[in-house]
């Protein structure tokens, strides 16, 4: 029994691009095995945050370190999901470094 005119939108965020690629592949494989149509994964723009920190505690304004955090994002749409698809996605165990947001529309 298919849920009519519905789709599941899954947004993934991670700092490590390898983890997010593995997780998206697991989600796509699981959805395709249950007979749902998958659109994606769509890579969204990478958010880069840069921080500059003074190394010395008192003087030496020129002594600084720069750090960067990159947040990778992916978007997956599952069109016409079945009940098996929803059950399989709920049972799926993903990596701990991946943030998953699921919305129905």
Curated annotation (Swiss-Prot):
GO terms for cellular component: ribonucleoprotein complex; ribosome. One of its GO terms (molecular function) is tRNA binding. InterPro entries: Ribosomal_uS10, Ribosomal_uS10_dom, Ribosomal_uS10_dom_sf. One of its GO terms (biological process) is translation. It comes from the Bacteria. Keywords: Ribonucleoprotein, Ribosomal protein. Part of the 30S ribosomal subunit. Belongs to the universal ribosomal protein uS10 family. Involved in the binding of tRNA to the ribosomes. This is Small ribosomal subunit protein uS10. It comes from Francisella tularensis subsp. holarctica (strain LVS). The gene is rpsJ.
């Amino acid at each position: 029994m298919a849920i009519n005119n519905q789709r599941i939108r899954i947004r993934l965020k991670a700092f490590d691009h390898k983890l997010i690629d593995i997780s998206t592949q697991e989600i796509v494989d699981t959805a395709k095995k249950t007979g749902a149509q998958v659109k994606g994964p769509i890579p969204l723009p990478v958010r880069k945050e840069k921080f500059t920190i003074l190394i010395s505690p008192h003087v030496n304004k020129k002594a600084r370190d720069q750090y960067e955090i990159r947040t990778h994002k992916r978007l997956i749409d599952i069109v016409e999901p079945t009940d098996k698809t929803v059950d399989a996605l709920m049972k799926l165990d993903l990596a701990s470094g991946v943030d998953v947001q699921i919305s129905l529309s």
